[in-house]
Amino acid sequence: KKEKKIKGIIHLAAQVAVTTSVINPLNDFNVNALGTLNILEAVRNYCPNARFIYSSTNKVYGLLNTVKIIEAPKRYEINKKEGISESEPLDFHSPYGCSKGCADQYVLDYARIFNLQTVSFRQSCIYGERQFGVEDQGWLAWFIIATVLGRKISIFGDGKQVRDVLYVQDLVELYEKFIEQGNNLNGKAYNVGGGLKFSLSLLEFIDILKDQGLEISYTFGDWRPGDQKVFVSDNTKVIKELGWEPKTSPVQGIQHIVSWVKKHRELLSSFMSD
């Protein structure tokens, strides 16, 4: 075998929808768990000095049954001042949570056993332009696309569920930081999101869209399996060890996507019809 000179690898490929994983759990496992193991083996054999980033998920923490959840008028809140930290017990829910969690653990173990330079970023909701969000995945982009195109939206649950949202350019800066500066961070997991400051519920998100002059039509449906009532990332560890913080507020990021969707209305109409 011949070693390749590769500086960094960012593993983003995945089956991304909880609902799809319930319909076809074997395919979900093959893509997320086995697929990640295949990539780790390739790194081990051909580029063991490359820095490897795994795009993991907050779903590895499950329904957060150990966390006290408080219901407010427009959102759920938790009794943790900074959000959910990496010390929260892992508790995979849904086939998607299991497959991503399995891959997450392999990524960390390959650092321990084979001394690879791997990290797992347990990401909350990532959003930005060029995100072709659909009902099952990419909810923030999906809401905007559907609203601009005059489509009705389904809210699964009561709309009070909360996520911290992270603009994609902020995430890219973190990836670059790790590849350039990530010394002695092998085998670590980091919660990565917008944090409490950049969190919002679905109902609060709808209010932001209305403030931007958009008319939105929606209905309510049943909760989906594995859907957390609230998840907010505690970014303390990644801030301390990599010197990174999210910069783009939800209002700013949403404005960027609304502008992009309006500019590419015809393309997105074709995508929606498919």
Please place each PLM-identified region on the residue numbering:
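Generic structural signal for alpha-helix termini and adjacent loop/cap motifs
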Residues: 24, 42, 46, 146, ...
